[in-house]
A protein has these predicted regions:
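An N-terminal, well-structured beta->alpha segment
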Residues: 1-49, 225
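Generic, low-specificity signal for short hydrophobic/alpha-helical stretches with a mild N-terminal bias
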Residues: 2, 13-17, 21, 49, ...
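YjeF_N-associated NAD(P)HX repair module
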Residues: 2-11, 113-225
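Conserved active-site and cofactor/substrate-binding residues in soluble primary-metabolism enzymes
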Residues: 8-11, 26, 30-38, 55-58, ...
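Structural signal for hydrophobic packing residues in well-ordered secondary-structure cores
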Residues: 17-24, 43, 96-99, 142, ...
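Nucleotide and nucleotide-moiety/phosphate-recognizing core
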Residues: 37-118, 124-148
Length: 225
């Protein structure tokens, strides 16, 4: 446990999401919406949102909708939008209904910030193909990089960086800090690490044996570690 709350593993993240829905009626859609709001607050400039194909992408797409409203959205790209499903696919459709063109080409025109929503806590091997190419492009973009949960390419449990991995300036980790952010390559790649509240009930964590201080977010809904 660090000074501001326990660390959480990728397996516990998955279990918490399932338990929140099945036991407590907290839909993944709601958590994704809260995540998007928090992420957008860290993007202070024209933002390119780079999405993968999982729930991490959904968080990025939700953030894009807020950035659009705030006049800070430069563009949105998804490695393979056809693979999105569930809440992430709903976020994609919402953006398209608002007239946002979600392309399969990552462009950095007008980019002051890149929101890295390519990989989240589930990665277990080195990125390949377009995933790897996009990570390398982000690192070469010259823009400030904000990563969702962990920098893409970083193992969220061990902190070991696969090649390639995103070099973030800021990492916004959702709910609780991920174990890999504090070990091995994690501190080097993550930049500033902020923990952001997305509304996950502490009772969910308690069911998994994770003790969260009840005052974790009492002073503010995000904090730096």
């Amino acid at each position: 446990m660090n000074s501001r709350g326990p660390l959480i593993s990728s397996a516990q993240v998955k279990a918490a999401d399932a338990l929140a829905h099945e036991r407590f009626g907290i839909a993944t859609d709601w958590l994704m919406e809260a995540a998007g709001w928090q992420l957008a607050r860290f993007c202070n400039g024209g933002t390119v949102v780079a999405c993968g194909v999982g729930n991490n992408a959904g968080d990025g797409l939700a953030a894009a909708r807020h950035l659009l409203r705030w006049g800070r959205l430069a563009s949105v790209a998804c490695v393979d939008a056809g693979r999105l499903h569930g809440p992430a696919e709903k976020e994609l459709q919402a953006l398209r209904k608002l007239g946002v063109d979600v392309t399969g080409t990552l462009l950095f025109e007008g980019a002051e910030v890149v929101l890295d929503a390519i990989f989240g806590t589930g990665i277990s091997r080195a990125p390949e193909g377009n995933f790897a190419a996009w990570i390398e492009a982000i690192n070469s973009s010259g823009a400030r990089v904000v990563s969702v949960d962990v920098p893409s390419g970083l193992d969220s449990d061990t902190g070991v960086a696969y090649a390639p991995s995103v070099q973030a300036h800021t990492t916004v980790t959702l709910g609780l800090p991920k174990a890999g952010l504090t070990s091995a390559d994690g501190p080097r790649l993550a930049g500033e690490v902020w923990v952001a509240d997305i509304g996950m009930p502490f009772e969910v964590y308690a069911e998994l044996g994770i003790v969260v201080p009840p005052t974790l977010f009492s002073a503010q809904d995000r904090f730096r570690i």
